């Protein structure tokens, strides 16, 4: 395997070729940094968190594919993943995970002690998550915690503490993550049932759309509470309205429960997150 082929394999293993997950992690992290700073965050902290999000997203993908390597070959969407297809060995994948994990931890060491402690919890959660799909019908709810963990870390890095405002944002992102990852799970539901992978899409059954809607509404309420705690105004409110618009569109897409529209609904959440971040940033600027 030449260097170009090796890069292609690593890129697919870490999902660098599919940045949607990185973006969905990035928007709430950036929102947390802006809220914690009351505007423009410290540049050093901002750069560390942006790089950290990219690295930890890659780590999460590697450990997820390692855990699912014997199942992914039976699922239409995942059978071409490098570990499932045998393009890379488990030893090489785990080595890459360790290298990236150490790089991320090295970045964290540039910050304060509270962030370091929170980061240890974060890496443990990241490792545990992929295996929850075998023991619970609610892995998306565990993922919501994993994908929201950068929020208390961001507040800790910027202010040295984690105030109540941070936990409102944490709750908002948790509800939102469960909603959009259930849309994602709807894409694989038929295959997951065959191979025994558990998900909220299977758990919710015929009420999946309604429960996703409830989680979207709960996320909205918590985003409102986070903004209210930080005394945000009209432009943040416009961002929230745009979020509602995207959420409504996603409900339309998943109505028929077909694979392609459900995946499109999942991808659309990137724009919902961008709208929230732009609304928040504009509210501080203007």
Curated annotation (Swiss-Prot):
Gene: ubiA
One GO term of the biological process aspect: ubiquinone biosynthetic process
Known pathway: Cofactor biosynthesis; ubiquinone biosynthesis
Entry keywords, A to Z: Cell inner membrane, Cell membrane, Magnesium, Membrane, Transferase, Transmembrane, Transmembrane helix, Ubiquinone biosynthesis
Source organism of the structure: Shewanella sp. (strain MR-4)
Family label: Belongs to the UbiA prenyltransferase family.
Function: Catalyzes the prenylation of para-hydroxybenzoate (PHB) with an all-trans polyprenyl group. Mediates the second step in the final reaction sequence of ubiquinone-8 (UQ-8) biosynthesis, which is the condensation of the polyisoprenoid side chain with PHB, generating the first membrane-bound Q intermediate 3-octaprenyl-4-hydroxybenzoate.
Subcellular location as annotated: Cell inner membrane
One GO CC annotation: plasma membrane
Cell membrane among keywords: yes
Name this protein carries in UniProt: 4-hydroxybenzoate octaprenyltransferase
Membrane topology of this protein: Multi-pass membrane protein
Cofactor(s) for this UniProt protein: Mg(2+)
Transmembrane segments: 21-40, 96-116, 142-162, 167-187, 210-230, 235-255, 266-286
